[in-house]
Amino acid sequence: MTDRIVPATLVFREDGTVVSPLYGDIYHSAAGALAQADHVFIRGNGLPERWRHERAFTIIETGFGTGCNFLATWAAWRADPSHCERLHFVSVEKHPFAREDLRRAAAHIVAYTTITTITPIAPLVDELANAWPALTPGVHRLEFDDGRITLTLVFGDALDVLPNLALRAHAFYLDGFAPSKNADLWSPAIFKSLAKLADERATFATYTSSGAVKRALDEAGFAYRKVDGFAGKRAMLVGEFAPRWRVRRHEPPRAFSTDRRDAIVIGAGLAGCAVVERLAARGWHVTLIERRERIASEASGNPAGVFHPMIARDDNLAARLSRAGFLHALHRWRALERAGHAFSRSTHGLVQLATSDDEFERMRESIDALGVPAELASALSRDDARALLRTDVAHGGWLFAQGGSISPAALAAAQCAAAGDRLSRIVGVEIARLERGGDGRWRALDASGATIAQASVVVVANAADAARIAGLRHAPTQRVRGQLTLLPPGSAPAVPLPVIGDGYVVPLANGVTLTGATYEPDDTDATPREAGHRENLERLERLLPAFSANALDAGALAGRVGFRCVASDRLPLVGELGDEAAAAREAAALTGARLRDVPRATGLYGAFGYGSRGLVWAALGAELIAAQIDGEPWPLERELAEAIDPARFLVRALRHGRVA
């Protein structure tokens, strides 16, 4: 189980500095947090000059604390007319402040700063606090200044999370509590983890000049030197990554190398449109190819879909992935709405009901054991559920305060609108296969062999057809038929928000109630059937006992059929595809391969196999693909990215000698 997050306690000393009762140390110098950030970390890393020569620049910080190093760096970037196009700031924090404590601490520090040469920071404090995520373990990605500033917060113990990051760092801010107060954050293991993430030209800066820190830096491959410290401190350390021997087996990720930033996305459902928006936001020109005449015509064309995280007592991979996807989706959707790209979604929460009293007890215990914040999920007794839903229920459950329902087609349209003139659409055309030319560019071909489009990068996002088009033999997916049912106004309990459990019920704006859905593997019938409606009505009766399945004529009801694409392990396939032909040639040498050893199909990516969780997973999957293409910090832990890596099935086949 993932360790629960213990928030920091906000305490001020008499001199106005913020202090940690847990570590018995101050977060910043009494001479000023922002001045310290400027002297030690910004100037200590040769900034802003060094980022002027990069399209994107990545900083890692050990210890986010009050956020002042990030705020000072953000302000310095704003003040520099020659700044890099995109600035990535990645910060690890074991004990993050709660939102309002962070706001108070940062606002207090800014109010008492004496710096006058940096862009005003006070307005940035509220932007940061307003975007502050729920205090759950893992990676949280926030964006500011139209996505040009990316803050990737990693909540957890640095010893555990640093080895699980995937990125290439240009600068390190080493800013934990003093080595005498928090020795773990200055241990050799920390610096070895940082060395595995360092760009060849990476620099570092830290306020300490401890002998133990110098030895750990040297052992990890960092060269250091002493310079004048801040506010009368005799010395601090700065330096660069300069290993005298090999310190890592794998190089950190690089950007995809191409002279032309153009891409093809195949499939205009939730998966594909999310990728379109994320690539276009980074300046890529995208051609979207859809076999139907309009976008979101297949499973993504349902009137509504529900979104919520999954909670499991052991906080397994699927639960962690759904939580990360859910929180990231909310962040992206709000950004779309702020940009004027509106779409229909409910904002009053979602209730998940237990199917038995024993299940309810397990649900309640899971919330307590994991320390789940109430803003993410809370236990709901049977009486409270009855009052909230205004109808009878058999058991209690969970309330997901930020869950709800959404129109998938409207979301897809908003994402395409956000892409603007960087998006070209080709509809009514079916791609049969892909081919990479001698010039390194991919061509999308129809059944006759005609080239429909060509680009440097291709993302296959067309569900169950993706593996076939990409020529994958080791990507086991299955079509699962799902039939939903539409109930006329007044024929079902008028619940004020979506309810899930054994099935789901969603109130639509026109008074119609949506319920479903069947789960029928390998059934390709696209026509709604009376038996499917009857199954949905019976499921609704179990979910909401005030409803009678016999009150309606199942044969007279309207509905819709969609097809889920489900992988054999029930996790999506997201990321760069494996080169199966190259793997076959090297099979003998790859029997013990890990994912990072597998040859890749350069420029070919996948986003499919989302099953019933497209709303939860699509935004995060799109961000991961865009980050991989552009060599940016990944928006989730490497362990989670590897769990959904499309090449995972190829690795398993190699280990069992099934690739030839």
From Swiss-Prot:
One of its GO terms (biological process) is tRNA wobble base modification. It catalyses: 5-aminomethyl-2-thiouridine(34) in tRNA + S-adenosyl-L-methionine = 5-methylaminomethyl-2-thiouridine(34) in tRNA + S-adenosyl-L-homocysteine + H(+). Its main location: cytoplasm. GO terms for cellular component: cytoplasm. Its EC number is 2.1.1.61, 1.5.-.-. GO terms for molecular function: flavin adenine dinucleotide binding; oxidoreductase activity, acting on the CH-NH group of donors; tRNA (5-methylaminomethyl-2-thiouridylate)(34)-methyltransferase activity. Residues 1-242 are annotated as: tRNA (mnm(5)s(2)U34)-methyltransferase. The keyword Oxidoreductase applies. Keywords: Cytoplasm, FAD, Flavoprotein, Methyltransferase, Multifunctional enzyme, Oxidoreductase, S-adenosyl-L-methionine, Transferase, tRNA processing. Residues 266-660 are annotated as: FAD-dependent cmnm(5)s(2)U34 oxidoreductase. Signal peptide: none annotated. It comes from the Bacteria. Its cofactor is FAD. Pfam families: DAO, Methyltransf_30. It is found in: Cytoplasm. In the N-terminal section; belongs to the methyltransferase superfamily. tRNA (mnm(5)s(2)U34)-methyltransferase family. Catalyzes the last two steps in the biosynthesis of 5-methylaminomethyl-2-thiouridine (mnm(5)s(2)U) at the wobble position (U34) in tRNA. Catalyzes the FAD-dependent demodification of cmnm(5)s(2)U34 to nm(5)s(2)U34, followed by the transfer of a methyl group from S-adenosyl-L-methionine to nm(5)s(2)U34, to form mnm(5)s(2)U34. This is tRNA 5-methylaminomethyl-2-thiouridine biosynthesis bifunctional protein MnmC.
